[in-house]
Amino acid sequence: MTLSFITRWRDELPETYTALSPTPLNNARLIWHNTELANTLSIPSSLFKNAAGVWGGETLLPGMSPLAQVYSGHQFVVWAGQLGDGRGILLGEQLLADGTTMDWHLKGAGLTPYSRMGDGRAVLRSTIRESLASEAMHYLGIPTTRALSIVTSDSPVYRETVEPGAMLMRVAPSHLRFGHFEHFYYRREPEKVRQLADFAIRHYWSHLEDDEDKYRLWFNDVVARTASLIAQWQTVGFAHGVMNTDNMSLLGLTLDYGPFGFLDDYEPGFICNHSDHQGRYSFDNQPAVALWNLQRLAQTLSPFVAVDALNEALDSYQQVLLTHYGQRMRQKLGFMTEQKEDNALLNELFSLMARERSDYTRTFRMLSLTEQHSAASPLREEFIDRAAFDDWFARYRGRLQQDEVSDSERQQLMQSVNPALVLRNWLAQRAIEAAEKGDMMELHRLHEALRNPFSDRDDDYVSRPPDWGKRLEVSCSS
């Protein structure tokens, strides 16, 4: 089957990119590709037989027209000015059979005009982390970019140490970022901001294109998508680590996996980025940061969208987020209805977990085994203050009984939203260290496991992390 690529970005937004081709790596080797995703995109298996080929930037497929995008952004609250694709190149937009499109974006593709002080390369460590994280999030049901392939090489890349250069093929419906809009707003080119908005509406919100109120309705939906995404992050214990405005997806996708982390111990102020000294992007601050970022996006639209309309959309953010968060947390607790004491029960559980540094994922998974008429629970053994747990658990079981739902039905619901497996940093690190020694078995094994996060397991993928695994520090270097 012939793949079809179109050039909407190149044709319709001529001042938002620089056209250039990838710079291949030395002795590139394909070490992993996403068979399931490739099948979804109708990519023939024969394409993966050329280990470097398009995956390593050596060739282009017919219809591809590679370019590096320019955008700007706020980083840690500070205006950073022009940024852009410093090591990534958009190879093309694949046109799928249903009329939708998928960007093919090659990360680690070499120097671009937006590389600033960088070398345009990515290392094997970071490409493995992003491939694992994006696929883990996808199978958790959270909107995200996807990973299609990883190529390693003999090209040395200099970070804190010398590491092997690598490339990741990332795919997504769009790479539109808040930072694209900021770039032209701060250059005082509001007509180009409007062109970006029109492009987004035309291709991703086409049902609004002929509506005279299209900009207000569109921004309302951007706010809603962002609120929903952040709510989902919070419920699975995901910390992004670098929520700069240039890393915010207009479509509400999880974008740019750098120093991310999933909660091990329940620590509301968890900071996964060792460069975040003030805790700007801590786990519990993510909802507020996302709203701040939306306010920056709204500012760029103010030349052609009424300020009252923008503020009305921003004012809806908190309620949308709380609605999505509340619905998912009630499911995680096994509540079939909404009752006034639900928030108090959840907050008391969080307080108990924080005091005891309980494992976030394991606590909710074990809670899924609760029988409403039995005081026995394997979760009890996880707590030191058994009296405090017993008091909370008795009230929790009383709340379950109000719903008049069988244990089996409730347990099935809870186990479908409380994963047994999340991508803990130590699991990723183990796969990385093996891969850097030439052993790709753990990378493939972990990828396969992450496809079924809600299935029970009896291996170390679902155990508490070792002490060294909790102390892993992750930086933005990639």
Swiss-Prot record:
Annotated function: Nucleotidyltransferase involved in the post-translational modification of proteins. It can catalyze the addition of adenosine monophosphate (AMP) or uridine monophosphate (UMP) to a protein, resulting in modifications known as AMPylation and UMPylation.
Keywords associated with the record: ATP-binding, Magnesium, Manganese, Metal-binding, Nucleotide-binding, Nucleotidyltransferase, Transferase
Coiled coil residues, start to end: none
Binding-site residues for ATP, renumbered to this chain: 84, 86-87, 107, 119-120, 170, 177, 256
Active-site residues from the entry: 246
Protein name: Protein nucleotidyltransferase YdiU
Organism (species): Shigella flexneri
A GO term for molecular function: ATP binding
Keyword Nucleotide-binding: yes
InterPro entries in UniProt: adnlytase_SelO (IPR054838), SelO (IPR003846)
Listed Pfam families: SelO (PF02696)
Binding-site positions, Mg(2+): 247, 256
Species classification: Bacteria, Pseudomonadati, Pseudomonadota, Gammaproteobacteria, Enterobacterales
Catalytically driven reaction(s): L-seryl-[protein] + ATP = 3-O-(5'-adenylyl)-L-seryl-[protein] + diphosphate; L-threonyl-[protein] + ATP = 3-O-(5'-adenylyl)-L-threonyl-[protein] + diphosphate; L-tyrosyl-[protein] + ATP = O-(5'-adenylyl)-L-tyrosyl-[protein] + diphosphate; L-histidyl-[protein] + UTP = N(tele)-(5'-uridylyl)-L-histidyl-[protein] + diphosphate
EC identifiers of the protein: 2.7.7.-, 2.7.7.108
The family this protein is said to belong to: Belongs to the SELO family.
